From Swiss-Prot:
It comes from Rattus norvegicus (Rat). Homodimer. InterPro entries: Aminotransferase_I/II_large, NHTrfase_class1_PyrdxlP-BS, PyrdxlP-dep_Trfase, PyrdxlP-dep_Trfase_major, PyrdxlP-dep_Trfase_small, Tyr_aminoTrfase_ubiquitination, TyrNic_aminoTrfase, Tyrosine_aminoTrfase. Pathway: Amino-acid degradation; L-phenylalanine degradation; acetoacetate and fumarate from L-phenylalanine: step 2/6. PANTHER family: TYROSINE AMINOTRANSFERASE. Pfam families: Aminotran_1_2 (PF00155), TAT_ubiq (PF07706). Its cofactor is pyridoxal 5'-phosphate. It comes from the Eukaryota. It is an enzyme of class 2 (transferase). Transaminase involved in tyrosine breakdown. Converts tyrosine to p-hydroxyphenylpyruvate. Can catalyze the reverse reaction, using glutamic acid, with 2-oxoglutarate as cosubstrate (in vitro). Has much lower affinity and transaminase activity towards phenylalanine. NCBIfam families: tyr_amTase_E (TIGR01264), tyr_nico_aTase (TIGR01265). Belongs to the class-I pyridoxal-phosphate-dependent aminotransferase family. The keyword Acetylation applies. The gene is Tat. This is Tyrosine aminotransferase.
Amino acid sequence: MDSYVIQTDVDDSLSSVLDVHVNIGGRNSVQGRKKGRKARWDVRPSDMSNKTFNPIRAIVDNMKVQPNPNKTVISLSIGDPTVFGNLPTDPEVTQAMKDALDSGKYNGYAPSIGYLSSREEVASYYHCHEAPLEAKDVILTSGCSQAIELCLAVLANPGQNILIPRPGFSLYRTLAESMGIEVKLYNLLPEKSWEIDLKQLESLIDEKTACLVVNNPSNPCGSVFSKRHLQKILAVAERQCVPILADEIYGDMVFSDCKYEPLANLSTNVPILSCGGLAKRWLVPGWRLGWILIHDRRDIFGNEIRDGLVKLSQRILGPCTIVQGALKSILQRTPQEFYHDTLSFLKSNADLCYGALAAIPGLQPVRPSGAMYLMVGIEMEHFPEFENDVEFTERLIAEQAVHCLPATCFEYPNFFRVVITVPEVMMLEACSRIQEFCEQHYHCAEGSQEECDK
């Protein structure tokens, strides 16, 4: 009689086939070890996915709170200027997209780093005597977020570290840690309009530091560094031989009483990868077109970093071709009045919000100079029923239906961030509700009754 004997190795969870013994017509044979996959399904998420962590999502998604149903929700939390419809892009920008689409020229693949003609336009737009640019110095990306990702990936290896601001945009940590790159936090100083604590910054640098991330103008702070402060940052980077990743997506989005200086315009010796895009200045974040500007006047990056960026860009075959086709018209034909009107609105809202919140006992807003944000300190000793900024903002939602992001999302507890792109009437209403909320929960600190009686 024919027979089959299968020998297996059994442990607590999995079994695998070792040998197959076959008897056919009285003749024995061993078919040998069965190699290949294990006998049981074992599909697990990658290490990269397990290391990927978004602080904003982790905090916001765990807020188990419903807004007051008797009030209309006012969201001051979303950094998307298109949400309320009050800040449309310029008609010239929209027409440029229509023309590119109607032309039928941009339906295929482009080079992974972008069309040469589109890169020439970006280089021409940002070229200046202090920081000259050519098309070879431009990499087009799928939004500024991908630009930042490519820069981190080309500059840092797993086990190295990067320096990022606190408070700062959470994406830096999310991207770095997913790649096995350590994050070190340097402090911004609210009492100095969020300037960098340069001494503390320099103390963090070691032999494994791959780059310094500088975000100017700042999300979440709305701060804009002075020329003098930028020069001091460059001096630290030059002393320590650390390249800079400059996140300048809010470049030129500064208020009339302030001046924006691109970091590369001030740098002779420090190599800089500057990240920008259409999202914020042109108010089209969903169009997903960003860029990397390579500034390397001393040829410190050499060909290796440039070639590395090209190779990394080939992973997704480049950004949207239709937007690239519209880029020349967008950069050349958007009227100055559009930029002026946008900034005038943002400054008006910033002044309104700052003035209203500064008058509320227990709050300490920091006046912004640009971008789309304002940070507000909470004097927690006057709100003892709340343990931290997360609880404060949760109750603000529950009672007043006003949604602000707790600054724990940006590694800076006991502050919250306000987005200033909402319509003016909505901003006024939000500030009024925040005032009512604070008045209901404010308590005099011990020994300060005189202040409360004022």
